[in-house]
Regions:
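Asparagine/serine/threonine-enriched low-complexity, disordered tracts
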Residues: 9-15, 34
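Ordered core of a single globular domain
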Residues: 599-601
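N-terminal localization/anchoring segments of enzymes in phospholipid and broader phosphate metabolism
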Residues: 2-5, 19-595, 604
Length: 607
């Protein structure tokens, strides 16, 4: 992403007109004032931050990580919007939390891969790995603080007027307290396991993105630790809240709906897990782990690619800790032990003033109280090439001309219809498709299974390296393989992100090829939300290229060029640059010129 030159002498108060202000939210407020306070313990950090900011101002590019955080800031703006309903504002807060989880899992995880192993990298913004990490942590800390301030000061006060109560145990009536205690004893208590850490027990493997109680207990006789000072032995143990428990216990009163955070219920009953033991402190916290991994891939067919993926998925569960979120009232003794154990700095600790995990708001948003506020998709309109959204015979329809689909405004149904009709059509000889992310209970996968069971040749490139969908993709790919599909689990050294479908049909005098090309996944759920383009075509100039492409990914074909397809990593970069240059030349020559480009992100500096 290119940062344009700006007038550094501007006196405008508009934050977006200030020099480098595309990155202004990334530095702490009053950072210049702190810098002048030489006695301030943050002096070194502030000096480093100033130097980092100066480097960024000179850079021509903005890094993807800083851009990601800026995007989250815009999502938070939606939660700030007082014209929106409580439902919408709470939803956008939940989205920012999910996004930040992914940021610390992937982007910070990737950065730690360099820092921990002494590898060098320079970010697009011009910063090396350590100062860049400091910059990211600082910006994320400020963002997190503002997010919690917004919830406590502006959004939580809206709960009562909307008939809701986010309760503590003390807010419950005596009868309600008895009800939740019964629920704890019958359902929760049997699921909880205290995991102690001492000289006879190793440090437990704690799960990422789950709520955990760190419990410090004391016991035994006092022992002298220094002159005039003695203390009793301390032990640390951990109690993980099971992920399959609902995040809130819901009580429906006549006048309001009460949401009791499950951690408050457990905290109230925690002593029963430590009978005859004195609890010094309980601290609720949550960790994020590195989820970014690189595969050591080989062309050697002896290498079991799927087993390697499975191993990496297991490793991800125990990846390096990249962030600790902790409640405001916490044990410094426990925190110190965790910092040492996970090789973290104090700046990696995110102290929260409100409920620890905002992703839990999704449970509140799914409550029937909000049923009428769920966003309604706009009515679908006929795509270009069709007079109606109703399609009879998809093959006959495609023969009449190309169909351009713009999702979610155009229905995804024509694509599903092509596959489902192909699966059941006795004249269809073969189906070839690339899959990246599919929905749960996928109609796409069901159609492919049905086609294979009916004896059709079905080739599927199922990209098992689709991040966080690896497990599901392996499971679905195995089903297809068992049904008789020819399944490729990916190409060594590459991630196949293309979305292509080809149906080969015997039409008596000739064989016809029907194709679909898309920017979006073959996923009927996300097609209702994500903006993507797709093309249904029988144009032989395109279908011949697609046939060549499938020969490349399923076999050993190496065509010198395609007539109309542009592929990466072979020639996409050069072709795009050539096309951009052509438009520049046309403009200089006074000819009609312009570029319309739909992209997810732009990271290639040359482009």
């Amino acid at each position: 992403m290119v940062q344009t030159d700006q007038n550094t002498n501007s006196n405008s108060n508009d934050k977006d007109s200030q020099p480098g202000n595309l990155l202004s939210f990334l530095r702490p407020k009053n950072w210049k004032i702190n810098l002048l306070a030489a006695k301030n313990p943050t002096w070194k950090l502030d000096k480093s931050m100033q130097k980092s900011h100066e480097i960024q101002l000179k850079a021509k590019f903005i890094s993807r990580d800083l851009s990601w955080l800026k995007f989250d800031e815009r999502v938070l703006d939606q939660a700030r919007d007082t014209s929106k309903s409580l439902f919408d504002r709470l939803k956008f807060l939940a989205i920012t939390a999910s996004n930040l989880d992914e940021f610390f899992t992937i982007r910070m995880g990737s950065l730690y891969n360099y820092i921990d192993f002494g590898k060098e990298r320079t970010d697009y913004s011009g910063l090396r790995e350590v100062p860049f990490k400091q910059m990211l942590i600082s910006s994320a800390q400020e963002f997190s603080q503002e997010k919690h301030r917004l919830f406590v000061d502006e959004i939580l006060p809206l709960f009562p007027e909307n008939g809701l109560l986010l309760a503590s145990f003390a807010d419950l009536t005596t009868l309600e307290q008895s009800e939740v205690e019964t629920y704890f004893n019958r359902t929760i208590y049997p699921m909880l396991t205290p995991m102690v850490f001492d000289h006879t027990h190793t440090f437990p493997s704690l799960l990422a993105k789950t709520l955990i109680f760190g419990v410090v207990t004391i016991g035994g006789p006092e022992r002298k630790v220094s002159k005039g000072k003695s203390e009793r032995d301390r032990k640390i143990s951990f109690v993980q809240i099971p992920l399959n428990l609902a995040r809130f216990y819901v009580i429906e009163r006549e006048d309001k709906i009460v949401f009791l955070p499950i951690e408050e219920l457990i905290r109230q009953q925690l002593q029963v897990l430590y009978r005859n033991v004195e609890i010094e402190s309980t601290t609720l916290f949550r960790i994020t782990r590195n989820g970014d991994f690189d595969l050591v891939e080989h062309e050697d067919t002896e290498t079991d690619f799927v087993d390697e993926i499975k191993k990496k998925i297991k490793d991800r569960r125990l990846g390096r800790v990249t962030r600790v979120e902790v409640e405001q009232e916490h044990s410094e003794f426990l925190l110190g032990e965790m910092l040492k154990r996970w090789s973290l700095e104090k700046s990696d600790i995110f102290v929260k003033t409100a409920i620890l995990d905002f992703t839990s708001f999704w449970q509140i948003l799914k409550h029937s109280e909000f049923k009428g506020q769920v966003a309604v998709n706009p009515p679908v309109v006929p795509p270009l090439g069709l007079k109606s959204i109703q399609i009879g015979d998809i093959f006959e329809t495609m023969k009449r001309g190309d169909i351009l689909l713009h999702h979610p405004y155009n229905n995804f149904e024509p694509v599903i219809q092509l596959l489902e009709q192909a699966a059941d059509d006795p004249h269809v000889l073969a189906i070839k498709i690339t899959l990246y992310r599919i929905s749960k209970n996928s109609r796409i996968a069901s159609a492919l299974l049905r086609a294979a069971e009916q004896g059709k040749h079905v080739s599927v490139l199922f990209e098992v390296k689709a991040r966080f969908d690896e497990e599901n993709n392996i499971k679905e790919a195995t089903k297809l393989q068992k049904a008789g599909c020819f399944v490729i689990y990916g190409i060594p050294g590459l991630k196949t992100h293309t979305k292509l479908l080809q149906v080969i049909r015997n039409e008596g005098t000739h064989v016809m090829s029907y194709a679909h090309l898309s920017s979006g996944n073959y996923n009927e759920d996300t097609a209702k939300l994500y903006t993507d383009l797709g093309l249904l075509t029988t144009d032989t100039r395109i279908t011949q290229d697609i046939a060549e492409f499938f020969n490349v990914i399923t076999g050993h074909s190496m065509p010198t060029h395609y007539e109309h397809l542009i592929t990466a990593p072979r020639d996409m970069r050069n072709r795009l640059i050539d096309m951009i240059q052509t438009e520049m030349d046309n403009h200089k020559a006074g000819k009609a010129a312009g570029i319309c480009w739909k992209i997810n992100s732009l990271q290639d500096t040359l482009t």
